[in-house]
Design a protein with these regions (language model features):
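Bacterial Sec-dependent N-terminal signal peptides
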Residues: 1-29
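Low-complexity, compositionally biased segments
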Residues: 5-8, 23, 69, 164, ...
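Contiguous, structured surface segment used for ligand recognition
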Residues: 22-155
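Generic detector of low-complexity/intrinsically disordered segments
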Residues: 9, 13, 17-19, 66, ...
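Feature activates predominantly on carbohydrate-active enzymes
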Residues: 97-303, 307-320
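Alpha-helical structural motif
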Residues: 9-10, 60, 126, 300
Length: 320
């Protein structure tokens, strides 16, 4: 067999495998693809008469109502008891039925939808799958099917660097919404680096009144223009930071979406912004000379400990 024929054989085999894979997953467009999807005959259409039924607590039910507002499920009200027809049941079940803290099962037939999970996290992720199914459906009509799903990886994260390019808290919330939609559960928040300090530390107010502001609109201009900082009220000032109240708000917003925020405080290197502000923490004792903390002075360790104490108080994450 010549090279041309070998290539055609390999190409044909590859296309055949892809085709078989796609045919097994017809009619569903969900990211990430659930572990198991079984298709049945028929379908179910969400109508103005469709209602949610659930055994979740009143507090959890209200939290879901608030979360779903503005989504394709936002118009579906919660009812007090199930009728068995034309409903979306959210069933918090025993772990012997659905195993895994983030696992869920969805069953759709002509009578309605049943979403089961042994944790509220599982219920939340099942709702993300329903939202994706609805957003890719015609007239809110879903195929009859059974989905059994759980994550392959326990850590599903996104890294967001707000030092080099600052994004306000509303942007961060939008990122969290997108992460939740795709069942991601960790935000690695890069809050400090040589290009800017972005978190309020009450013991060191100059970190946000000076080290959070650059006299250049573009990062590259700052990079080649001396890498200096300026006062917050300088007309050239570009940057920003999060107050501690902002941090608490974003952390709570993430928790409602079952996302843990892991803050990063850069040390001992990439610390030009700190050493420009507090040059006594550098080995030269001068601003704009060093990028690394001086480990030969006790002042450095006192500074880092004080910073981390405030950071730890703001973030419930296991890791900092």
């Amino acid at each position: 067999m010549n090279t041309h024929n070998i290539f055609k054989s390999v190409l044909f085999s590859t296309l055949l495998l892809i085709g078989n894979s796609c045919s097994d997953r017809k009619g569903i467009d969900v990211i990430p693809m659930p572990r198991s999807v079984e298709y049945h005959s028929g379908n179910f259409t969400i109508s103005p008469e469709t209602k949610f039924y659930t055994n979740l607590s009143a507090e959890s039910r209200q939290a879901l109502t608030d979360y779903l507002e503005g989504t394709s499920l936002g118009s579906v009200p919660f009812a007090e008891s199930a009728t068995g027809n034309n409903g979306i049941e959210l069933n918090l079940c025993d772990s012997s039925i659905v195993t895994g803290n983030e696992a869920y099962r969805i069953e759709i037939d002509k009578k309605g939808i049943r979403l089961s999970a042994s944790t509220e996290t599982g219920i939340f992720y099942g709702l993300q799958t329903l939202l994706q199914l609805l957003n890719n459906s015609d007239n809110k009509t879903l195929p009859a099917l059974t989905i059994n799903d759980s994550p392959r990886f326990p850590y599903r994260g996104l890294h967001l660097d707000v030092s080099r390019h600052f994004f306000d808290k509303e942007f961060v919330k939008k990122q969290l919404d997108a992460m939740a939609y795709f069942k991601m559960n960790r935000l690695h928040w890069h809050l400090t680096d040589g290009a800017g300090w972005r978190i309020e530390i009450k013991k060191y107010p100059r970190l946000t009144s000076f080290a959070a502001w650059r006299p250049f609109d573009k990062l590259n201009d700052w990079w080649v223009g001396g890498r200096t900082f300026c006062e917050q009220d300088d007309p050239r000032a570009v940057g920003g930071y999060y107050t501690q109240d902002d941090i608490r708000e974003v952390v709570a917003y993430a928790a409602e979406r079952h996302i843990t925020i892991i803050p990063e405080i850069e040390m001992p290197g990439h610390s030009e912004e700190v050493l420009a502000t507090y040059p006594e923490l550098s080995c030269s004792g001068k601003p704009y000379v060093n990028a690394d903390f001086c480990i030969g002075t006790e002042k450095t360790f006192e500074f880092l400990e004080n910073v981390l104490l405030e950071v730890i108080d703001l973030f419930p994450s296991e890791y900092i």
